[in-house]
Amino acid sequence: MGYAGLKQLIEQNAWREAGRELGQYMNGEWDDELAVLAATVFSALGDWEGAYTCIAQGLQYNYKNYELYLLLGNYYERKNCNQAWLCYENALYYCSDEDDRRIIQQHKERVQQDDRWCVHKVSIVILTYNLKDMNMQCIGSIRDTCAPSSYELVVVDNASTDGTLEWLQEQKDMTLVSNQENKGFPAGCNQGIKAAEPENDILLLNNDTIVLPNSIFWLRMGLYEEERIGATGSMSNSVINGQRIEAKLAGVEEYITYGTAMNIPMENALEKKTWLVGFAMLLKRKALDEVGLLDERFSPGQNEDVDLCIRLNLGWQMRLCHNSFIVHYGHGNGRNSYIWEQTFSVTSEKFREKWGFDMSYYTYSRKELIAMISEPKESRIRVLEVGCGCGATLAHIAYEWPEAKVSGIEIQDDIAKIGANYLDIRQGNIETMQIPYEKDTFDYIILADVLEHLHDPERILQKLLSYLKADDSILCSVPNILNRHVISDLLRGKLEYQDAGILDRTHLRFFTMDSIVRVFERCGMEVTQMMATYDTEELDAEAEELMNALYQIPHIADRQLFQVYQYVFRAKREREAE
């Protein structure tokens, strides 16, 4: 497609005329050439957000277009010299025209004169243990997608026996540490970090990954978004902690296509996180130097990434980069699922011994409650969560509703301190504290598995109602004491409290669907929306027989109610309920 008239106006610096000329193309078919021209015009007219939109659209068509990264650098120069420099570095990587390379280099050098400029090269630390083909694919993907000047490879081999070590020894572009025994993940990573250039940022990367175009570029852009960001992490197809994409695709090739299309400029790309999974975690060198290396008590591996992030939370913040996708097979380093589960159990206990709490208990994002928020994503909602843990649910709300203002109350002091590092979280006991907010403030108050811990749930509901706007909602979840596992045990004379679950030893109150509805009714509220989650664990044969007999008793509760694990619901004041 030709744009001769538009190009001529740009060459003449006739920007207003160019803007009018551009109008005839805006609703037609786009390509990356038009995106370059449009972004150039918008930039010249001072419409930087319009320029950004055009750049993002152009990179959808051609992620290798160096002119778009040059324009993206111009966009960031106004606000962040480090991110601008990274864009110019990426433009150089994709540019083969020598004249244009000189221009881009001049941009880089100019930005480097800024006193605030401080960008470090990345040392990519990879551990290998057999799986030769996978190792070759991982390392090859880095070579194929990253500017050679932007990184160094540091590979730690944990005594491979399948030819991996011999192949690594033939490579000329990496630092190799060769162990005579398998030292595990934390110790191996520490060896790699120590072998890296001392000023470099560190990317811990699993060997069962495929790096896609711009995966690491956007991790670095996220890391330098703010000075206090100490670590960034990627999205993937196989990962926990809210880092897995929702799309279910057929295989690796489809994920490569999907991920490549994701790795472009994105509005609201960064989500605040309490911790990041270590399969692909980029660490700012200054932050790592402050908090120290991975804790080798977690060898052979699992939970060392959570531990590192807890230490980072004492002064640094973490971000999940939604526009950085890395394919993850999820079974590298020679682990199988049984060994993984056994190791995770052992290292989780070590984590509890070190920190005094179970991290998974306090960092779970309650997406089923978030799904009950009905306001448009551009709304300026106010949300309070009581019993917010480290703030995972609040952080995800703040990501999904960028204009939202979220606040939390957490009873555990050490947990509240972690969350307060990146969100408005206050420590306090909701049953005794003065709530530090104005009345009639919140659109939503969240009580996720809280009421069962209270001495007087109805008094607290009445207390919280005054902080809720007149026509807005409480979002709540409670475990179901009528669950078949609990009832079958009771009928056999058993009642054993647990560390977590329906019979959590800290529970003071128990609810059925009917009883929790009545609690809210007595507080002048009506449950307007309810859903249930069901347990999938099979009963033993004796319990199954007992429950089947119970179901036959006249006037017994509906059979389905015994299968419910938890109720999740939304409630409003009765006078405002529709």
Give the role of each language-model region:
Residues 252, 260-286, 501:
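A recurrent flexible, glycine/aromatic-enriched loop bordering the glycosyltransferase active site
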Residues 140-150:
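Short, acidic, metal-binding catalytic loop of nucleotide-sugar glycosyltransferases
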Residues 157-166, 181, 388:
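A conserved acidic beta->alpha catalytic loop
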Residues 137, 333-440, 444, 458-461, ...:
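Conserved N-terminal segment of class I S-adenosyl-L-methionine
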Residues 178-196:
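Glycine-rich, basic loop-to-helix element that forms the pyrophosphate-binding segment
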